[in-house]
Amino acid sequence: MISDAQKAANAAGAIATGLLSLIIPVPLTTVQWANKHYYLPKESSYTPGRWETLPFQVGIMNCMGNDLIRTVNLIKSARVGYTKMLLGVEAYFIEHKSRNSLLFQPTDSAAEDFMKSHVEPTIRDVPAMLELAPWFGRKHRDNTLTLKRFSSGVGFWCLGGAAAKNYREKSVDVVCYDELSSFEPDVEKEGSPTLLGDKRIEGSVWPKSIRGSTPKIKGSCQIEKAANESAHFMRFYVPCPHCGEEQYLKFGDDASPFGLKWEKNKPESVFYLCEHHGCVIHQSELDQSNGRWICENTGMWTRDGLMFFSARGDEIPPPRSITFHIWTAYSPFTTWVQIVYDWLDALKDPNGLKTFVNTTLGETWEEAVGEKLDHQVLMDKVVRYTAAVPARVVYLTAGIDSQRNRFEMYVWGWAPGEEAFLVDKIIIMGRPDEEETLLRVDAAINKKYRHADGTEMTISRVCWDIGGIDGEIVYQRSKKHGVFRVLPVKGASVYGKPVITMPKTRNQRGVYLCEVGTDTAKEILYARMKADPTPVDEATSYAIRFPDDPEIFSQTEAQQLVAEELVEKWEKGKMRLLWDNKKRRNEALDCLVYAYAALRVSVQRWQLDLAVLAKSREEETTRPTLKELAAKLSGGVNGYSR
């Protein structure tokens, strides 16, 4: 006979068993989950076994798994563990968050290889994943080279990105692009891979787009394009072990007072020279555990990808989109000595140098000196506008070039994908310090333009060059029109400078004096001007178009836009690449640079998203008027009176 105590014990056990199904797992961050559950398979890992997240990987992985961040871009070199990070994040989404995922490789064959050599061994070696894969190791409809369907109902697809059909029908929560720079920029003439792929997550409650790649050619690189769409470009800053000052690691060169240095013909002597106080840092001394990711555009920073802070240290919400850059010098999987050997080998061959820049530095390769661009290339881009502002344009910026006897202003319209349309050219003759001249500049800044949809547009942001005149003139006009609308700028002809750097605070004159990286901007814009023309009715990212109006654009303006060429010059005993106008007039080019800088600062500082703005504008123009709504209620033709 069962005693009352035993009955009670049996009942308690039964209740406990029944309640197990109601237990909700404690939520884990991506890094917490990976450190607890993730294992590296021996087939594709230098160090198989339990995963341990590296300091620089923490922020990246947690951002990838952060539901409040929609888009994560990673510009990377080789040997930083990106593929393993991506697999760990995918496993986290599948097992911990029960999210459907779609991962794109550049081709179908690459996708199959990835599934066989990376995904399947990961499922086998990660117990939490294997538990969800009862079909593992045998033929099953849920176990194919394109789809893994887990017992939880969650699906993981791995497809090639070269066929447009692979971007259709799937509805997922997470879409990833591995080696995005190897994708075709236009998938079977249906659009960019990220544009097509990100359509698959639009219905998700927590949509996530992860893009990662070693970069390729500057100006045409897919990961560079993706990164430029984000307002936040993060670099990993680590403290100097001697002076404590933070800095992100740079390769440097012979002329740089920082970066990797070594004795001639002795790669083993390599050390890092601190850019703040010239401290000598050896690789074994560098402690990355106190590093933090800092945005070079906004000053925003994070240590862990979970909590974000402003440059002043105030906690702020996570960004909608974020870009990271990481390169080989941070990796424990190689040595600085090997980086030097790779560099010396690369110097022997131009192709090797390109490979070094892409795969070791994680930077885009800038095509060097080329022939001067023929202005006829731009004349071939002349198209007929249906209005002063073409239909696809959603944002206007202007650049003003200051001369001693005039101001020249060019107005540019921008469409999604940074498609550019020249809208207007205004030359204001007169002394720059005379009020009458400046009043005409005021009128030009406030001029209204008729859009193809019938509405009026004004210039949203202006970059006004202070070179050649008293800067106070521009400062006063900036305050008159709004210190955020009219930005005084000065050029910085130094390679590697951002297109525009806006200070966090006003200067002593009460305005934001911005620095424009003219060489960087010209590199970008010349690459776009060289591109083959496309039909005006075909939206083309980065295309540059000119109006069929000789008052605005003629051979004169075309010649000014191509006035400069990239030349090699010896400076201080070192060969440098410089933009040289050969004393040709180049005002149109300068104004385009400033107008483009105005666009870029709008993206970086005010999170301008041309695609979102276009969608908003489309919804606004298609919304029925009160008159049309009244007609619909009264039974007009097709709901509206005509």
From Swiss-Prot:
Pfam families: GpA_ATPase, GpA_nuclease
Keyword Electron transport part of the UniProt annotation: no
First and last residue of the signal peptide: none
Entry EC number(s): 3.1.21.4, 3.6.4.-
Domain of life: Viruses
One term under GO cellular component: viral terminase, large subunit
Role played: The terminase large subunit acts as an ATP driven molecular motor necessary for viral DNA translocation into empty capsids and as an endonuclease that cuts the viral genome from the concetamer to initiate and to end the packaging reaction. The terminase lies at a unique vertex of the procapsid and is composed of two subunits, a small terminase subunit involved in viral DNA recognition (binding to packaging sequence cos), and a large terminase subunit possessing endonucleolytic and ATPase activities (DNA maturation and packaging).
Protein name: Terminase, large subunit
Organism in which the protein naturally occurs: Enterobacteria phage P21 (Bacteriophage 21)
Gene label: 2
